């Protein structure tokens, strides 16, 4: 039996055909299909462009046979910033695409992909000074030296010793 296919339409009007089980890695899509049955029309994905949706669906296809995560998995996954090798390579994209993937994973309710995106960002920050973080993310420092000193004093407890 041939696998069931769905058509998803990105916010830039491009149709992407995808196996149903791949699309159902998104809880948003899975719940929608459970409520509505088999769609005869393309499923609009209004918040995601074609290139980002294609990238997200590539991740979903690679992870299509992963078991659903349990609450226990969530706890242990939250405590580590380790990322599997395939996922690390998958996340080697420019910053704009990385943030678009994170936003799409959040919108489409794909928690494992959202976790990997956030861990990738956490690893970009880990061990860096505020100045290095600003440089990495092109953030303008709008604090006066006095405000910076006050923030450092208030957050002394959080510094590595």
UniProtKB/Swiss-Prot annotation:
Pathway: Protein modification; protein ubiquitination. The keyword Heme does not apply. SUPFAM superfamilies: POZ domain, Skp1 dimerisation domain-like. It holds the Pfam family Skp1. InterPro entries: SKP1 (IPR016897), SKP1-like (IPR001232), SKP1-like_dim_sf (IPR036296), SKP1/BTB/POZ_sf (IPR011333), Skp1_comp_dimer (IPR016072), Skp1_comp_POZ (IPR016073). Keywords: Ubl conjugation pathway. It comes from the Eukaryota. Gene3D superfamilies: Potassium Channel Kv1.1, Chain A. GO terms for biological process: exit from mitosis; G1/S transition of mitotic cell cycle; G2/M transition of mitotic cell cycle; kinetochore assembly; mitotic cell cycle; mitotic nuclear membrane biogenesis; negative regulation of cytoplasmic translation; negative regulation of mitotic metaphase/anaphase transition. GO terms for molecular function: cullin family protein binding; DNA replication origin binding; ubiquitin protein ligase activity. GO terms for cellular component: CBF3 complex; cytoplasm; kinetochore; nuclear SCF ubiquitin ligase complex; nucleus; RAVE complex; single-stranded DNA-dependent ATP-dependent DNA helicase complex. Residues 102-161 are annotated as: Interaction with the F-box domain of F-box proteins. PANTHER family: SKP1. Belongs to the SKP1 family. Component of the SCF (SKP1-CUL1-F-box protein) E3 ubiquitin ligase complexes. Essential component of the SCF (SKP1-CUL1-F-box protein) E3 ubiquitin ligase complexes, which mediate the ubiquitination and subsequent proteasomal degradation of target proteins. Controls sulfur metabolite repression, probably by mediating the inactivation or degradation of the metR transcription factor. This is E3 ubiquitin ligase complex SCF subunit sconC.
């Amino acid at each position: 039996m041939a696998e069931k296919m769905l058509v998803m339409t990105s916010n830039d009007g491009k149709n992407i055909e995808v196996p149903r089980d791949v699309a159902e890695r998104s809880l948003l899509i899975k719940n929608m299909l459970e409520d509505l049955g088999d769609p005869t029309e393309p499923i609009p994905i209004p918040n995601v462009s074609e290139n980002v949706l294609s990238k997200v669906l590539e991740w979903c296809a690679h992870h299509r046979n992963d078991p659903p995560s349990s609450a226990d998995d969530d706890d242990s996954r939250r405590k580590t910033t380790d990322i599997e090798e395939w996922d690390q390579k998958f996340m080697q994209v420019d910053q704009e695409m990385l943030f678009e993937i994170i936003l799409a994973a959040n919108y489409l309710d794909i928690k494992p992909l959202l976790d990997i995106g956030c861990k990738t960002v956490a690893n970009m920050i880990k061990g860096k000074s505020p100045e290095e973080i600003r440089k990495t993310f092109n953030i303008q420092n709008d604090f006066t030296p006095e405000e910076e000193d006050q923030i450092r004093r208030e957050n002394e407890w959080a510094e590595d010793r």
